Structure formats: structure tokens, C-alpha cells
């Protein structure tokens, strides 16, 4: 197990080299953040316009409906732009030219699969919140466990959608689950390793925002706030790109046995450990 975790960190380090070779991929998660923020703002304006703000807190139907809408928006937009990153990363692994426009076109071609997954994810997420609200304590624990299980089962769903295009939710789930079972240690460590590697930058950005809000004034406050916000957004963007690069490479190895991208310079006998 220790070997799996160490090897996962090696994959993260190698993925940084891939990102440096194609820094333009950062525009995709940045567009995702803008799109999600704009969609949430539109929903918020609609809620205020129709006087539904009070009902969101008092009416279960309205509250869960708003929750479903929020989850569907974040899931659909997130998967769409992640699919674009996966397409670009996969083409780069194959030595082909690619661009953000190519990735967006590929994601658009897979829009039906993305829409289906978004609705499924939003439905499951909403049902878990309903269970939590109706069974305090037990519901919270159950939601946490099921959320974790769902996250692991669907870890490779985006690469499956982009590369396999089966059109079947069951088949996509099975493929994602099988790939995760073959690379679980490396996958988990890579996911956490990316966050840990960028945590100091994120923390610095958050501290700047706090100082700007609490104690700074004038131009100093605006400067710290802008720099802190920029650091936080930058880490979110880089985290998303690296995560998709790693998942794409690990999925290719799990399904085809190919060592591509961040795995290409590593010895597979050292990176992948049989239990």
C-alpha cells in the first residue's frame, strides 16, 4: 500500500511536466468557473425576481428543486469542460496537435452522454440530501459513505465518456469501476497529492483575502484581495487540469496497458504494484 501511495505522487509530479507543455489547457477550467458562476447568478436572480427566497428555506419542494438545479448545473458544466481537457490531453499523449477549441468540440459531440450523467448525479445528490434531512445523524453518515462510494465508482467516468462513447450509463459505470479497481492506490494518491502540492498556494490566497477583509484598508485591501483571489482561482484551475491529465493517463493504462503522458517517463513495474 505504501508503494502505491508513493507511486501516485510520482505520477502527480510527472503530470506537471505535461501541463507545462500545454499551459493553454488552463482556459478550459477557467471557462467552467465562469459558466457555473454565471448560471448560479442567473438562478439567484430568478429566485429573487419571483419572490422564492423565503420558500427556499421553508418549502421542501422548492428547496430540493433549487438543490437539484444547482447540482445539475455544476455537474453538467464541470463534466463538459473536464471532457474537453481529457480530449486535449489524450491527443497530446498521442503526439497530435490539439487546442482548447478541439476539446470543446469533442465535449459538444458528447453532450448527450454528459447531460445524462449530470441528471443522474444531480438526482443521486438530491436524494442523499433528502435522506440526510429526514434521518439526522444516520442520514449524514449514510450520505457521506454513499458520496464517497459514488465518487470512487465514477472516478474515471469523464475519460470513459470521451474515449469510449458507449452511450450506456451501466457500461460507463462498469468501465470506470473496473479501471479504478486496477489503479485504486495510484488514483487516490494522485487525487490527494495534487491538492496537497497546491495547498500552500491556496492557503496563501485565503490568508490574503482574510487580511484584506478584516484589517487592510484602501488600496492595500484591494491589492491583497485581488492577489488572494487570483491565487485561489489559479490553484482551482491548475488542480482541475492536473486531475484530468492524471485520470486520462491512468485510464489509458488501466484499459490498454499504455504508459502515456505523465506515465511515459516512469517505469510501469515501479509505478504499478500488484497487491
Predicted regions and their residues:
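Hydrophobic alpha-helical membrane segments
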Residues: 1-275
Amino acid at each position: 500500500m505504501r508503494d502505491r501511495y508513493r507511486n501516485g505522487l510520482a505520477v502527480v509530479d510527472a503530470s506537471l511536466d505535461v501541463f507545462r507543455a500545454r499551459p493553454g489547457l488552463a482556459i478550459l477550467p477557467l471557462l467552467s468557473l465562469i459558466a457555473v458562476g454565471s448560471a448560479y447568478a442567473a438562478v439567484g436572480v430568478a429566485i429573487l425576481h419571483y419572490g422564492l427566497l423565503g420558500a427556499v428555506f421553508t418549502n421542501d419542494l422548492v428547496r430540493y428543486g433549487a438543490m437539484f438545479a444547482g447540482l445539475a448545473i455544476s455537474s453538467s458544466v464541470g463534466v463538459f469542460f473536464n471532457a474537453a481537457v481529457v480530449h486535449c490531453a489524450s491527443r497530446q499523449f498521442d503526439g497530435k496537435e490539439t487546442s482548447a477549441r478541439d476539446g470543446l468540440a469533442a465535449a459538444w459531440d458528447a453532450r448527450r452522454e454528459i447531460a445524462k450523467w449530470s441528471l443522474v448525479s444531480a438526482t443521486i445528490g438530491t436524494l442523499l440530501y433528502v435522506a440526510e434531512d429526514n434521518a439526522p445523524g444516520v442520514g449524514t453518515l449514510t450520505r457521506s459513505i454513499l458520496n464517497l462510494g459514488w465518487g470512487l465508482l465514477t472516478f474515471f467516468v469523464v475519460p470513459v465518456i470521451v474515449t469510449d462513447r458507449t452511450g450506456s450509463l451501466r457500461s460507463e459505470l462498469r468501465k470506470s469501476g473496473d479501471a479504478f479497481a486496477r489503479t485504486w492506490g495510484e488514483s487516490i494518491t494522485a487525487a490527494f497529492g495534487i491538492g496537497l502540492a497546491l495547498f500552500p498556494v491556496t492557503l496563501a490566497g485565503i490568508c490574503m483575502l482574510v487580511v484584506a477583509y478584516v484589517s487592510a484598508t484602501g488600496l492595500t485591501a484591494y491589492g491583497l484581495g485581488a492577489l488572494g483571489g487570483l491565487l485561489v482561482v489559479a490553484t482551482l484551475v491548475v488542480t482541475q487540469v492536473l486531475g484530468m491529465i492524471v485520470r486520462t493517463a491512468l485510464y489509458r493504462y488501466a484499459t490498454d496497458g499504455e504508459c502515456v503522458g505523465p506515465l511515459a517517463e516512469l517505469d510501469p513495474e515501479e509505478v504499478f504494484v500488484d497487491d
